[in-house]
Amino acid sequence: MRNQVDATVELAREAEAAGLRSAWFGQTFGADSPQLAAIVGREVPGLQVGTSAIPVFGRHPLLVSSQAQTAQAATHGRYHLGLALGTKLLTEGGFGLPFERPIARLREFLTALRQLTRDGTADFRGELLTAVTPVPARVPGAEAGVPLLVAAMGAQSLRVSGELADGILPYLAGPRALETHIVPALTAAAESAGRPAPRIVALVHGVVTDDVAAVREKATGHLAFYEQIPSYARVIEQSGGRRASDVAVIGDEKTVAAEVRRYRDAGATEVVFAGTEIAGEADRRRTWALLGDLAG
């Protein structure tokens, strides 16, 4: 099996050459996404890099701040940190932690993390988390701070994100869900808190292909896991879908370009594609070529 870091850097170079502007890295139980983003950002200076997204359970703000500031210094200001609530299944099954009060934990995590990444110090004592720096926690080179985004789609997480974060990273949320539910709730929360207009980085599962039926059937299997998670099931329904694959963007160049425009019109400030390898290398490259043209 090929070295994952080497393969990722190679793909990132290809993405830059295709005209893409950013590369985002998920976090599971394998590679450390902030480290991966830092390496890619150093090796491929034309790309913005980000993490989408680190669960707030099983992590501590002090450690995540160290990772994020190091990645920001390594990339000279091109790193973006995404956080997520995570799921009950992975939190309790993987970390052995009770999945309790996730919204309160997100609020405390963001509050402490903002202090750390902005000021290089923290003196936060909440109900669930404590983050205190007896010595400075600033990483030279990361003085500008780190953009904080949240994989938020529900009403409560959108409220917290609007108040405390710089934006959101909704996944499997189609244009209808963005326009009618997500964007209004997030924008209202940000305005009430006196915050700037938030970024809405729509994460879209999609690919350019001529074999639409077969690829959508394959996507149905790949994405079925998300249908078991209440927050995803809800946003899929809000998007007008029954299955997660109903929200996937699959079709020829004209179809995919039109869907990207729909996301933009619905309020997405950035559109990021995932799963572009599902139909093979030729269609992945075809997808990247289109997205590079749209980005240009």
Language-model features: locations:
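Active-site-adjacent structural elements that line small-molecule/cofactor binding pockets in enzymes
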Residues: 1-296
